[in-house]
Amino acid sequence: MNIGILTAGGVCPGVNTLIRSITLREKSQGNRVHGFADGFRGLNQNVKTYFDQEHIDDGPGSILKTSYDFVNVDEAVNNITGLDRLYCICGNESMKSARDLALDDRVDTNIIGIAKTVFNDMPGLESLGFQTAIQELARYIDCAYIEAVSTNSIVFLEVPGRGNNELVVHAGLARNSKITNVITPST
């Protein structure tokens, strides 16, 4: 069987570990694994490489690179011909491209969407990266608190939230932090 993997949208913790796990599992079953560079941009342009598990580390980012491009279904349909499965490791917006591809009648490939986002903004899905982002932010909050107490200062931290603010709320509660106020923009 021929397998494809792509990552689309922003980066988050655990992506390379997931890519490596998928690759090892698929190769253990005798399957060939291909990675599409730069997410849906690479899929649209058929930019792919054969994956060997020795070449995948579990460091930060994505070994495949990523982009915010959306799928061009007409181009992508031709480029996934011959693939039995395509793993799409996507955030909220880029998952819509995976859906569009999966719903196209010309596609015979199984499209598997795997949620990855530090914002936890995909209702009903647990996403890769959210828990690690909470842990890292909580550690950063602890350091900022120590700085504030040590210098008799007030510290402001700006944290991205994409409208739902789950990351900052969970991180603030993660270690019984001494956060006094959380100011969120009105939506």
Spell out what each predicted region is.
Residues 1-41:
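N-terminal phosphate-binding or glycine-rich loops at protein starts, especially the Walker A/P-loop
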Residues 4, 26, 54-58, 78-82, ...:
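Solvent-exposed alpha-helices and their adjacent loops that cap or buttress functional pockets
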Residues 114-127, 149-151:
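Acidic/polar active-site rim loop that often engages polyanionic ligands
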Residues 12-22, 43-44, 71-76, 91-99, ...:
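Short glycine/serine/threonine-rich phosphate/pyrophosphate-binding segments
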Residues 42-96, 118, 126-139:
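Glycine-rich oxoanion-binding loops at beta->alpha junctions
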Residues 33, 88-91, 96-100, 105-108, ...:
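Accessory alpha-helical/coil subdomains and C-terminal extensions
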Residues 8-11, 36-41, 68-69, 91-93, ...:
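Short, ordered loop/turn segments at secondary-structure junctions
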